[in-house]
Every structure is written in structure tokens, then in C-alpha cells.
Amino acid sequence: TAQGEGLRNTISLRGRAGLGQGRLHWSSNFDEVQDFEGQIRALAGGTGLMSDALFNTGTRNQPLGTSKAGQSAELDALAAYVGSLNQMPLSAARSSSGALTAAAQAGRAVFAAQGCASCHGGASFANGGGTLLADVGTIKASSGKRLGALLPGIDVPTLRDVALTSPYLH
């Protein structure tokens, strides 16, 4: 829609390339940075960064349609910039020596006991790149849409740098 879809609390791009988290947005409705072309045109009311002919070829005008990569130098530059964001700041959960603080060790115990790794697992503490949407009981009809249909769940975000990315869904 012209107003966007789904939940609108923006997920941080900090360290995103380093995590390889995959699709963008809580609703996982973009599979490449270049998909923002549609929002530039509809939501922002702009003319876009690629020609109308290229944008309207095949399914390219749909978020998960034909790839837009290589069709606009500006969109590719934006994607390259996002891809350069591969550094995470030092964690407040670690001491200057790199060891987990006592509070972080207690948090690790809760994480293990509650089975958090079933969604927030692996090196990125996420669910694998946006292909698995999860509903942790916070999704309702008013949460928005995903690709024109009711939002079935969210793309489980990384827990890296979680102290800086509130609010949380559970």
C-alpha cells in the first residue's frame, strides 16, 4: 500500500551485513535493499531511481519480484552502503577483557532455560534470514499486512546489540 505494510518500528541496520540476516523489515517483505524503489515511488511520492520501463518489467515492481539489482546505480550504491555496515559496537555485556559480565552470564542462563535459541539461534541470534516468520502472540489484525495479506508473523530479529533496539515484542 502507499502507507507501507506491517509493523513500522524500524530494525537497525547496524552490523546487518556482518550477520547476513537476509530479508528486510519485520514482515520480511523485501529481499534486497533495492526493493525500497517501490516505497520511494508510493510512500514517499517520488519518481524513483530507476526508469518506469525497468521498474514495470515482469514482477520487478513487486517487493519479492524480479531483482532490481543492477538496474539503478543509486539503488546499487545504497545496497553497497548497507552491505558495508558489518561492524557491531562492543557489547555492554562484556568486560574490557571480553569476558561476559555477571549479569550477562545470568541472562545466558535464562536464555538457555527458556529455549530462546529455538528462534534466536546461531551466530546471528536470529532465525535464519527472514524465511521463517514467527508469531509470538503479539500479532493481531491491526498489526498490518505482508504482501497484501494479513501479517502472519515477524522476521525474528537478531539479538545482537539488543539493548539499543527496543521496544521488544515479548
Where are each of the predicted segments found?
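Periplasmic c-type cytochrome electron-transfer domains
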Residues: 1-170
